């Protein structure tokens, strides 16, 4: 029910040897900085009871502002008590619909839309420098040019992917730091319906992360340079998250759905990447969704919970009948 550019993405570290650079979407970690203080000059005027004179004095007061930032210096929005209550209710909703329980309260960061986009770009660039050895990116792009896959220079290709990071996501859950990140309106007491729908989706991923132990699982894959299990688990995870989000949206009445549509931010994303770049996303969100619906039809939510561990291969995601045959592929 969301277009390709609005698909809610479960971000991962860049894997330079996985699918020949098909997946270069990254979000790694977030932390809060110390609150900052600033000096504010306040002018005070004292009127002396006299017909001849008055005096003005200037005093300096230290005003403390409790503002938190992530590790890239991007502001994190405060969570009002009303938002926290909404978040608590959404946590309960996700637990009820999945039949699973959080081991610990999910971690989350709230940003403005611009702040969220800045975080996506900054975190990608941070990991890009760590993940690619000197000259490796240039050689990869040159190879793709030789095969006729792209016509971009290494620098232009990098710029396109960075912009894709900025604009293509409505919310995210990070496998490694286990933090849910969502852009919300600033200076509001309550989350609007659109924001809640995004949080429901990402809360499912947060729950999956705790139940499956995704952080350790992903770290082991990266250490062993073996990502064969990734497509199957990612597909099931997205299918389950889409399903629970769909449940939540289905409970809205007509007016609420109209409101939610009007609350959706402008996610314009005019970036055009090479066609092969989107192949994994078609696997996760399209074919994975089809497999997830079939599993749910046959075995309800218990079947999807089981599938988080009994992983399909990429071939079985494309051909669900092979998954249900229980034959090895």
Which positions does each model-derived feature cover?
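C-terminal motif of bacterial Sec signal peptides marking the signal peptidase cleavage site
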Residues: 29-30
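Extracellular mucin-like PTS domains
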Residues: 41-59
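Catalytic zinc-binding patch centered on the HExxH motif and its immediate surroundings
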Residues: 117-138, 155-180
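Short pre-active-site segment immediately N-terminal to the catalytic Zn-binding motif
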Residues: 181-200, 232
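Catalytic glutamate of the conserved HExxH
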Residues: 198, 202-210
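Post-HExxH zinc-binding segment in Zn-dependent metallohydrolases
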Residues: 211-215, 219-261
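Short helix/loop segments within enzyme catalytic domains
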Residues: 244-270, 296-310
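Pan-zinc metallopeptidase signature
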Residues: 272-329
């Amino acid at each position: 029910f969301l277009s390709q550019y609005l698909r809610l993405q479960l971000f991962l570290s860049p894997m330079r040897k996985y699918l020949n650079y098909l997946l270069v979407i990254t979000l790694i970690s977030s932390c809060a900085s110390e609150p900052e203080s600033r000096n504010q000059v306040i002018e005070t005027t004292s009127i002396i009871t006299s017909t001849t004179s008055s005096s003005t004095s200037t005093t300096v007061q230290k005003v403390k502002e409790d503002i938190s930032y992530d590790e890239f210096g991007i502001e994190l929005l405060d969570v009002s008590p009303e938002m926290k209550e909404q978040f608590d209710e959404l946590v309960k909703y996700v637990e009820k619909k999945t039949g699973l329980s959080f081991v610990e309260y999910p971690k989350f960061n709230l940003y403005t839309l611009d702040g969220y986009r800045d975080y996506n770009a900054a975190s990608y660039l941070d990991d890009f420098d760590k993940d690619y050895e000197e000259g490796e990116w240039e050689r990869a792009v040159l190879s793709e040019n030789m095969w006729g896959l792209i016509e971009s220079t290494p620098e232009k290709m990098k710029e396109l992917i960075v912009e894709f990071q900025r604009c293509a996501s409505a919310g995210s859950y990070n496998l490694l730091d286990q933090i849910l990140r969502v852009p919300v309106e600033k200076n509001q007491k309550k989350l609007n319906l659109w924001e809640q729908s995004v949080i429901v989706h990402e809360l499912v991923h947060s729950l999956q992360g705790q139940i499956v132990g995704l952080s350790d699982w992903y770290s082991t894959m990266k250490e062993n340079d073996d990502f064969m299990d990734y497509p199957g688990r990612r597909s099931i995870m997205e299918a389950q998250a889409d399903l629970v989000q769909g449940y939540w949206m289905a409970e809205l009445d007509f007016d609420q759905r109209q409101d939610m549509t009007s609350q959706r931010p402008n996610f314009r994303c005019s970036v055009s990447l090479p066609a092969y770049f989107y192949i994994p996303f078609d696997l996760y969100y399209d074919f994975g969704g089809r497999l997830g619906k079939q599993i749910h039809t046959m075995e309800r939510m218990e079947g999807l919970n089981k599938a988080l561990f009994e992983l399909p291969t990429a071939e079985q995601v494309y051909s669900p009948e092979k998954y249900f045959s229980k034959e090895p592929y």
